[in-house]
Regions:
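Conserved short beta-strand edge segments in small beta-sheet-based binding/regulatory domains
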Residues: 78-89
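Short, surface-exposed basic-aromatic patches at helix termini and helix-loop junctions that form
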Residues: 72-77
Length: 113
């Protein structure tokens, strides 16, 4: 399963269109392909900053559903911009640190002389 952080941005000119489009997903009136796609997404949290015209969503998608889950992005692409970043949980990051402690990582040579 992959975990992602998605940042969605809009402008004052596209705010209403995005809200109307997103409402069709929430209310279940979007095209079936979009609703099926969104059903593949396990939303962990979604936070919205109205002052900055952006929202941040943390979600997970099963590896086998990655392609289909992108249908939602295509549905929204003309009313907002989206950035998606693959991430790991803090708990998984701690496992990485246990596997390779900082003292085992060589110090870089000075970049300036």
């Amino acid at each position: 399963m992959g975990r992602f952080v998605s940042i969605t941005r809009w402008t004052p000119q596209t705010a209403r269109a995005l809200r109307e489009r997103w409402d069709t997903v929430v209310k279940g009136t979007a095209p079936k392909a979009v609703l099926d796609s969104f059903a593949k997404v396990k939303v962990i949290t979604q936070e919205i900053s109205l002052d900055n015209n952006l929202s941040v969503m943390v979600y997970e998608v099963e590896d086998k559903d990655i392609v289909e889950a992108n249908i939602v992005s295509v549905y929204l692409q003309d009313v907002c911009t989206q950035e998606a970043y693959p991430v790991i949980s803090f708990e998984d990051w701690m496992k990485v640190n246990e596997a390779l402690p900082m003292e085992k990582v060589p110090k870089p040579e000075s970049w300036t002389k």
